[in-house]
Amino acid sequence: MGKALAKASTLAISENGLEKTSSRRRVEVLKTYKIYIGGQFPRTESGRYYIAANSRGEQLANICLSSRKDFRDAVVAARNAFKSWSGRAAFNRGQILYRMAEMLEARKAQFIEELMKQDASKTHAQKEVTISIDRLIYYAGWCDKYQQLFGTVNPVASSHFNFSVPEPTGVVAVVAPQDNSLVGLVSTIAPTIAGGNTCVILASETKPLCAVSFSEVINSSDVPGGVINILTGKPTELYSHFASHMDVNAVVYCGSDSTIQKELQQKGAGNVKRVLIYQDVNWPDEKGQSPYYILDTQEIKTTWHPIERVGGGGGGY
């Protein structure tokens, strides 16, 4: 059982009635990390779990193996939250993202400890948590600015104003990076919700601790239930359903498995779903953040607004 067994000193009664100290080994209680759906922390519908371990074989926690039913429940929660979240003022979405950064800062020590349990050095863990906090602040600042950057007023040869404005695409399903389990997770969640989308995230299978702890940060950060939903488990069991589910509008895959990429693209094409592949992205680097990641899950809406009597003489066009 590795470190799951720990020595404990106990008191026992000897034959003559006197207390004596004896030593025995007890089973350490591993925390069970639940999934996060609709602002709640349910257990997986399947009742299946796996034990997360590090490279030294130390058992860290019990992790839910999410099922297709869990994924469907998460999509329903994300769809129900979409109308309210996309209709919020962009400035308010920025405030909520900034609040997430504040709450992550308050629990910095916990996340550093969890990263170190998952084989990161202390220096690397401190750096990853700091970058994750800064990344949330970065996207909080973009919430009310990206539309001005990517929106346009188009010249047209008729008596109309013509505007093209980015709007959220809807429910986005994300297969998060397997490495960089915290900063990679934050770097895919933040631009998705900054643009008004809701999301369902499948966290890292091999390093899931920070992902589930991050859901506790989300739950205490004014994020409405259903805007962010975090599942844990095996990508090989769920990724195909990400692309085939008819109520998912876009899929983001962070990985280099060509088989998964091909199947996502084929199934996504079958129901006209946007499929985004982020391969070999160094998420802790500055290139891991950009307003163009917000644009990736936006649709450009063009509006024609009729006008009359323009020009000095009021003669129109």
Where in the sequence are the language-model features?
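Periplasmic-binding protein-like
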Residues: 190, 250-254
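Residue-level signal for inorganic ion chemistry
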Residues: 57, 93, 196, 228, ...
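Conserved small-residue-rich beta-alpha loop and adjacent elements
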Residues: 55, 141-224
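Short acidic active-site motifs
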Residues: 124, 160, 237-238, 260
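A structured beta-alpha segment of the ubiquitous adenosine-cofactor-binding alpha/beta core
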Residues: 161-162, 230-246
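Hydrophobic/aromatic ligand-binding patch that stacks against planar heteroaromatic rings
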Residues: 190-193, 241, 267
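N-terminal Rossmann-like NAD(P)+-binding subdomain of aldehyde/semialdehyde dehydrogenases
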Residues: 2-160
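C-terminal segments
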Residues: 2-16, 24-25, 134-149, 163, ...
